[in-house]
Structures are given as C-alpha cells and as structure tokens.
C-alpha cells in the first residue's frame, strides 16, 4: 500500500467545473509552447496570467451559484492562493513535473481540451462572465484549439 486515501466528492458537477477552470489555462500554456513548458521557465508574467485566467473561471463558477472545489481553493482571490499557484506553475515549468502533470495529457488530448474549452466558454457566456485573460491565453495557444 501507498497509504493514499481516496476521498469521495459527492458534488462532482462543481468539482469538474473547477477542475476545468484550473486545467485549461495550463493546457493553453502547453499549446503556446508546443508541449515544452520549460520555455516558460522564468516567464512570471505569463504564469501570473495563467492564474488570472483560473481566477476568472473560478469567479464565473462561484457567481453562477456553484461551490468552489476543492475547499482549499475557496479563497481563490487571496494573495496566498496566487503564491501557491505561482510556486506550482514555476515548478511545473522548471522540472519534468510539467510534462507529467500537464503537457503529456494536453498534447495527446487536443480534441478533448478543445471541447472542454468550448463548453467552459459557453458556461461563461450563459452566466454573463467576463473572461478577457482566458480569451487572450486561448488566442496564444494558436493552431491547437479548434
């Protein structure tokens, strides 16, 4: 045994919305760099824009009446949340963690990520959300997203 404890999440709809809001900005980064996140090493401005896009997504989800999950992300507009995310994204871009956590999946699941992005944008639009940073990162992803 790994002693890893599986935790059941009864509110799967909200969890999946939040997961998409966190994962898609990372996928955009993968597409911007053709799967080589190390190209973003040291590009703190871009990494902060990834966090901004994530926050836009979380804000839209919360404002539509959904719960932000996991609970640890509830204070997503705090400086502490930004610091944690920035550390994580820097680690992803400086080590093989980015390949394991994001780019391998994103680069082999372009159709899935494109569909997920379309669904998230439809959700944002249906709920009157503003998401300019998300749209900018999406444009920078280039030819990958359909």
Short names for language-model regions:
Residues 51, 55-146:
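NAD(P)-dependent Rossmann-like dehydrogenase/reductase catalytic/cofactor-binding core
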Residues 1-70:
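Internal alpha-helical scaffold of NAD(P)-dependent oxidoreductase catalytic cores
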């Amino acid at each position: 045994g790994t002693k890893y404890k599986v935790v059941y999440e009864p509110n799967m709809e909200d969890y999946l919305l939040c997961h998409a809001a966190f994962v898609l900005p990372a996928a955009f980064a993968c597409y911007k760099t053709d799967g080589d996140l190390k190209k973003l090493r040291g590009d703190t401005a871009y990494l902060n824009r990834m966090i901004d896009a994530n926050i836009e997504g979380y804000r839209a989800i919360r404002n539509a009446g959904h719960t932000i999950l996991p609970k640890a992300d509830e204070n997503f507009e705090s400086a502490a949340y930004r610091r944690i995310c920035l550390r994580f994204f820097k680690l992803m871009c400086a080590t093989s963690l980015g390949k394991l956590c994001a780019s391998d999946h994103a680069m082999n699941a372009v159709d899935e990520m494109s569909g997920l992005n379309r669904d998230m944008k439809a959700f944002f639009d249906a709920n009157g959300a503003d998401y300019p940073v998300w749209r900018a990162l999406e444009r920078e992803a280039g030819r990958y997203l359909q």
